[in-house]
Amino acid sequence: MLIKLKSKIHILQNIYLKNKYFLKKKSYAMDGEDLAINRHTNNIKNGFYVDIGAHHPVHRSNTCLLYQSGWRGINIDINEFSLDLFNYLRPDDINIQRAVSNYNGEIEFYFQKDFSQLNTTDLYWAKENFNNNFQTKKVKCQTINDLLDETKYKNKKINF
């Protein structure tokens, strides 16, 4: 447990110091999607976003640029470590560890590494892409409507 905590602290320090999170970049998304989002929402000040499968608050993030522009929102990801990063780097957002589904309950989660964008709840996809080399665990799942209703943003218009 102590080793896991030290590892998380070390990674968080590296993200802050090496990536200089607070120095703005032109784009954080993988292929500039955040720039397109910014163009389409440019006239909206203090907007609200919901990022399902958020994964990382900076690296390949479609919402980091919005956050830096004053928007706030909800970041949802299955991975506990992802949420630790969001809580550290985006404290003004609501960050929720959950799978989004068409029902409330539990769902199987298939993964090779604890922290990967390739982890999935789709067994067929996991078998095909992980060559049957993956682990499984049950995680909480919830409908997006029920999840949003539990936050301070209930009934708020989603801008992105």
Over which residues does each language-model region extend?
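Phosphate/nucleotide-binding beta-alpha loop and adjacent structural elements of enzyme active sites
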Residues: 1-160
